[in-house]
Amino acid sequence: MTAAGELRPVDGLALSPEHRAALRPGEAVTDEQGAVHRLPRFFFQVPSWQEAHALRVASHFALSELITVDSREERLLLRTFPHHVPCAILALARYLEDFRRAADAPVFVSANGGYRSPSHRINQGRVSLHSWGTAADIYRVGDTYLNDEKSIARYGEIAAALGADVRVRAYKEGDDHLQVDLGYLTVVPRECSES
């Protein structure tokens, strides 16, 4: 598996009960503003970590770069394969590739800074766009670490200029990354049915 076209989509509702409990496919959740959103229902199945490293989801990004998590991830999802990644991860990869081109430098996403499940303990019961696979925490661009207001603002302007569908979180005291997101985007693969 080396190209995004080789990813196998699966309906999250057809996964094991344990996986459904951790991923909560299609479940309605309420964000901090009171808006209701549905968690992703359709996922790409990733057979192994080696395949995640080999799979190019964009010219300069391997899938593994967008799904690296730490021990706060749900144990089942962290330690067993296959992994399941929301299909919208491909839209995020395409956006990050455009950002890399605009910044004219390699882009680095932090651990827990790409996709993480709704069960990840860093979420602390909150709704996180990371659970849709549509948010990225960028900690470095080229040789520049994004750990101060000036560097985050500089690359935030570049990120925001790429389109109205992108939201760039404003700098807050103590930030050590630039957060970008594409919203609550869900993808239904052509070969999948919502019925």
Walk through the language-model features, giving the residues of each.
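Catalytic cores and adjacent binding grooves of peptidoglycan-active enzymes
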Residues: A4-L13, V127-S195
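Surface-exposed loop/turn and secondary-structure junction residues enriched for glycine/proline
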Residues: V69-R72, P118, N123, H130
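Extended, low-complexity, intrinsically disordered C-terminal regulatory tails
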Residues: A91-Q124
